[in-house]
Amino acid sequence: MTFKNKLKFYVITDRKYSCEVYSVEQALKGGATAVQLRMKSSNTREMVEVGQKIRKLTLEYDALFFVNDRLDIAQAVKSDGIHVGIDDISISKIKEIAPELIIGASAYNINEMKIAESEGADYLGVGSVYPTNTKLDARYLGLNGLKELSNCSNLPVVAIGGINHENVKEVLMCGVSGVAVVSAIVGANDIIFSAKKMNEIIKKYI
């Protein structure tokens, strides 16, 4: 499976819903092809310990593993890549320090997309497509905005924000390479079942 193909079903952790290691293992069993560790309020030691366990799982299931924001953690756990926002460490600095890492960059508009592309990002996380409870300060993009950025970008686009089983079909029809999901998967009562159901829908369009 190519790098781009592995972006199609991208699951992001959230402790508010479930333990990171447990939710990742369940999501991978259900067909997730990429995982991002996001632990905003945890200390470095805990992030490394959790990250190392997730690294083993993603290798076992041949899935991509990204760390949110923290370059030091990404290097410590030997993740495949890192995902950064517009206000985080610059892409150019990451490439200077850790050229081996795949770099994902968040983008809300064409200007942010062009900055990420020019600095050398490998894929874009575009959104928030819909209102979302996992990031209350997220800017709302909508399907038209997603479609515009997807059509303009030279990079693989992963849609994010409020995506669930009911609306994922219309998101996938916007020309994206994948979808990033949080609560619809890690917040589900049965994560494996929820992931399998999502994966079945994604496979019809990507």
UniProtKB/Swiss-Prot annotation:
Gene name linked to the record: thiE
Binding site residues for 2-[(2R,5Z)-2-carboxy-4-methylthiazol-5(2H)-ylidene]ethyl phosphate: 132-134, 162, 182-183
Xref: CDD domains: TMP_TenI
Enzyme Commission identifier(s): 2.5.1.3
Record's keyword annotation contains Metal-binding: yes
Name listed for the protein in its UniProt record: Thiamine-phosphate synthase
Gene3D superfamilies linked: Aldolase class I
Keyword tRNA-binding: no
A Pfam family: TMP-TENI
GO cellular component entries: cytoplasm
Keywords: Magnesium, Metal-binding, Thiamine biosynthesis, Transferase
Family per similarity comment: Belongs to the thiamine-phosphate synthase family.
Pathway: Cofactor biosynthesis; thiamine diphosphate biosynthesis; thiamine phosphate from 4-amino-2-methyl-5-diphosphomethylpyrimidine and 4-methyl-5-(2-phosphoethyl)-thiazole: step 1/1
Residues at which Mg(2+) binds: 69, 88
UniProt binding sites for 4-amino-2-methyl-5-(diphosphooxymethyl)pyrimidine: 36-40, 68, 106, 135
Superkingdom of source: Archaea
SS bonds (residue pairs): none
Reaction(s) catalysed by this chain's protein: 2-[(2R,5Z)-2-carboxy-4-methylthiazol-5(2H)-ylidene]ethyl phosphate + 4-amino-2-methyl-5-(diphosphooxymethyl)pyrimidine + 2 H(+) = thiamine phosphate + CO2 + diphosphate; 2-(2-carboxy-4-methylthiazol-5-yl)ethyl phosphate + 4-amino-2-methyl-5-(diphosphooxymethyl)pyrimidine + 2 H(+) = thiamine phosphate + CO2 + diphosphate; 4-methyl-5-(2-phosphooxyethyl)-thiazole + 4-amino-2-methyl-5-(diphosphooxymethyl)pyrimidine + H(+) = thiamine phosphate + diphosphate
Cofactor(s) this protein requires: Mg(2+)
GO terms assigned for molecular function: magnesium ion binding; thiamine-phosphate diphosphorylase activity
A biological-process GO annotation: thiamine diphosphate biosynthetic process
